[in-house]
Amino acid sequence: MKKNGLFFLILLFSSGLLAQDWRTNWDDAKSEAEKGNKKLILVFSGSDWCIPCIKLEKEIWINSTFNEYAKDNYVLFRADFPKRKKNKPDNVTQKRNAMLAADYNPKGYFPFVVIMDSQGNIRGFLGYEKTSPKDYIIQINQF
């Protein structure tokens, strides 16, 4: 029993170490990208209904290879549009996400990844495709 509890705690804490550090304030994310001369990655996601979004999360965003590279090179921001009431963000976040969608994803594609330079200029777009985290990094860096 003690071994199971210890294993659970190790698993819980180690999974948190692999989780990407997604910014929650858009203005802070833009400022951090500029100050750190990092690419700004804006991700439009439907985390509880969009199957390609869920695959992108599992295959790329939470992968340790991607995370190790991203922490020094990217500032990540997610605008999530869940459908289930229990997953919906607060009203302020919903309004902010809607404004971001109007500016950067007016056609409403999901998942939709906007790659910007450190000054906030759009350099390219990606979506989901079955690829490795290493190849996804290469695609991002081509912009």
What are these regions, as identified by a protein language model?
Residues 36-50:
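Short active-site neighborhood of thiol/selenol oxidoreductases, capturing the structured segment around
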Residues 24-40, 70:
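A short beta-strand-turn-helix
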Residues 54-69:
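Typically the conserved alpha-helix immediately C-terminal to a functionally engaged Cys/Sec
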Residues 50-53, 113:
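The canonical Cys-X-X-Cys-His
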Residues 1-21:
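Bacterial Sec-dependent N-terminal signal peptides
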Residues 41-42, 76, 113:
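Hydrophobic beta-strand anchors of alpha/beta hydrolase catalytic cores
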Residues 22-23, 67-95:
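Thiol-based oxidoreductase modules, predominantly thioredoxin-like and allied folds used
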